[in-house]
């Protein structure tokens, strides 16, 4: 597996791995009919938007690493109360 692909499959790097997998699985199950999977795509897009805002906030505050680890993301989601996307 190429290193870029491995990085994208790493839960510490990609916070939206489950959303990405769900949208790909939907495409596979629905014969690549994009209209049927639009809710999955929207959820993935909202996930990326949410975590990007967290990265920007951490960068602004000088917190490193900019992308929280998987454990930190779980804490953030618990603090929010539920998945905001």
From Swiss-Prot:
Pfam family, one: COX6B
PANTHER family, per database record: COILED-COIL-HELIX-COILED-COIL-HELIX DOMAIN-CONTAINING PROTEIN 7
Quaternary structure, from the entry: Monomer.
Native organism: Homo sapiens (Human)
Gene that encodes the chain: CHCHD7
Paired cysteines (S-S): 16-47, 26-37
Main location: mitochondrion
CHCH domain span: 13-55
Pathology noted in the entry: A chromosomal aberration involving CHCHD7 is found in salivary gland pleiomorphic adenomas, the most common benign epithelial tumors of the salivary gland. Translocation t(6;8)(p21.3-22;q13) with PLAG1.
Cell compartments where the protein resides: Mitochondrion intermembrane space
Organism lineage: Eukaryota, Metazoa, Chordata, Craniata, Vertebrata
Superkingdom of origin organism: Eukaryota
Protein family according to the UniProt entry: Belongs to the CHCHD7 family.
Annotated Gene Ontology cellular component terms: mitochondrial intermembrane space; mitochondrion
Any Gene Ontology biological process: mitochondrial respiratory chain complex assembly
Motif (Cx9C motif 1): 16-26
Short motif Cx9C motif 2, span: 37-47
Name assigned to this protein: Coiled-coil-helix-coiled-coil-helix domain-containing protein 7
InterPro entries registered for this protein in UniProt: COX23 (IPR051040), COX6B-like (IPR048280), Cys_alpha_HP_mot_SF (IPR009069)
Alphabetic keyword roster: Chromosomal rearrangement, Disulfide bond, Mitochondrion
């Amino acid at each position: 597996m190429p290193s870029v692909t491995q990085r994208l499959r790493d839960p510490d790097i990609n916070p939206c791995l489950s959303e990405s997998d769900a949208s790909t699985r939907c495409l596979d199950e629905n014969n690549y009919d994009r209209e049927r999977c639009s809710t999955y795509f929207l959820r993935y897009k909202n996930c990326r938007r949410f975590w990007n805002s967290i990265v920007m906030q951490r960068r602004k505050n000088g917190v490193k690493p900019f992308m929280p680890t998987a454990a930190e993301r779980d804490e953030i989601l618990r603090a929010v109360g539920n998945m905001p996307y």
